[in-house]
Amino acid sequence: MWNPNAGPNPYPPQVVCPGGSNPACPPPLNPAFPPGPCPPGIPQGNPAFPPCRPPYPVPQPGCPGYQPSGPYPPPYPPPAPGMCPVNPPAPGMVGPGIVIDKKTRKKMKKAHKKSHKHHKHGKHSSSSSSSSSSDSD
């Protein structure tokens, strides 16, 4: 089982410090990914993804000045500086992660319909338009 010559503590403390927090013990180096710029020669790491430069343009996550490369025309109108181009949400969606119950959605639909200034012709029109009273001059 345990070595009787090991002393009072049968499990000696670990000599290896993996984190590199001890200045006497530097962190272990990974030979597959050496630190620093790529040396001119054989590419290290995964040959499918060389660490020097990607084989395709990677868009930066920063929004200002982001131009997608490709045959797509620029968005019209161009977004204001400092604002990201935003795709309109699908119908029924309000925003990222926002869920609205049916009652509130119905209210919002009604308010949205009211905001349109189109005259609706039909039996169920609750508002009496003033266009029919124009003959009382």
Swiss-Prot record:
Keyword Disulfide bond: no
Cellular component terms per the entry's GO annotation: nucleus
Record's keyword annotation contains Chaperone: no
Region (Disordered): 26-54, 94-137
Top-rank taxon, per record: Eukaryota
Positions with biased composition (Basic residues): 103-124
Entry's localization field: Nucleus
Residue ranges with Low complexity bias: 125-137
Key words, A-Z: Nucleus, Transcription, Transcription regulation
Predominant place of localization: nucleus
Task of the protein: Negatively regulates TSP1 expression at the level of transcription. This down-regulation was shown to reduce taxane-induced apoptosis.
Protein name: Proline-rich protein 13
